[in-house]
Amino acid sequence: MLAQLIMLIVMCMQRHWLYAAMLAPSLLGSALMLITMIMRVRHEETNSNTITGSDSPVPTHHNGNEIDHAQLFADMPSISFEHLHGLDNDPLIWRTIVRNWLVRSPTNGIGMSEHGIFHIDLASSGPHAMVAGTTGSGKSELLISWCMALAIRHSPQTLHFVFLDFKGGSTFNALERLPHTVGNVCDLDLAHAVRALNAIEQELARREALVSAERVSRFDQLSHPPARLVVVIDEFHALRDRLPDYMQRLNRLASLGRSLGMHLIVCTQNPMGQVHADMKANISLSICLRVTDQMQSNELIGTKDAALIPPAFPGAAYCHDGQRTVPFRCSAVHDIDSLVHAINTASAFSGTTNPSPLFSAPLAPHAGKDDLTAPQREAWHHVPFALSDDGVLISTAF
């Protein structure tokens, strides 16, 4: 372009107007191309600055071109669940919980991010979630904190839990005592697990019938909507491997749960190939704690970052809701027994009746009179004499 400009000047000085006229269009085209390139570069620089600005959830701590994960999570406050919710110095925690139940906040704080308290709204961001993390990553603590955050914000009249733990641990033992809990399988008893899955299927059908009978499209449009049901499954791969024939029932739950108020939280150590494509298509909320392989992290959140979380930060995780990925640190519950007691006290003060179990353990070989339930209304023909089992619940036969 510079050579063309010099030649044009020479032609003009020598008054060779014909040659100058021939050079002018070419010179003008080159100038326009240069201007276009400059504008494009400036536009790309502006977009780059916008994406990595202060309002972006992308981490801002870098060492060269790599995120300094240790510094990233070290800068996030590590506080207890009680302190996060202002309960650590509360002399009457149950009273605060009752107040929370009356407000019914949709969001639930479970930890701290770079910009403050990290909240999750399962109903709008989900309605289902997948949680992954290797041993020692803090997965159990995150599940407990998440469920406790739900329990202190929603009363047993509006929220129920079902817990299925297939690693034979004690993750949900304390949560079983919550007034919200309507079922818990905390061992490797497959017969008990089958009853739980049958009960979930029956509840799904019951809610479908309610919605159909009132000719509405969503459960919250019902005149008397049932409580939301959150089904938490730990070590999902064990359930899939041992009861593969029942996976279709959970696929239906994932497909229809949004409109019926039923939510699924699937937990595993390795997210690679653990969830059927039909179920995965309905899971839009992913939380990845530390994993051992970058492919596992990419599978869940679309980046390798979760595989680079230092082991010194249990509870550190990335949350991906389909649009953005946010790093956060989970706030672990310090005294779960005291908190569960406060929730039960709040339930008793509110006068709420604990929900009936959704399922029970299989019928024992022998039953005593203490296992029988007296009829609510005395009648000469209501004489309890045995226990009956319909494959889901055990009840007293009259």
Where are the regions a protein language model picked out?
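Membrane-proximal helical linkers
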Residues: 43-65
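P-loop NTPase catalytic phosphate-binding loop
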Residues: 1-49, 100-301, 307-310, 372-398
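Surface-exposed polar/charged interaction patches
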Residues: 12, 34, 44, 60, ...
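Conserved P-loop NTPase motor module
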Residues: 65-107, 114-117, 125, 130, ...
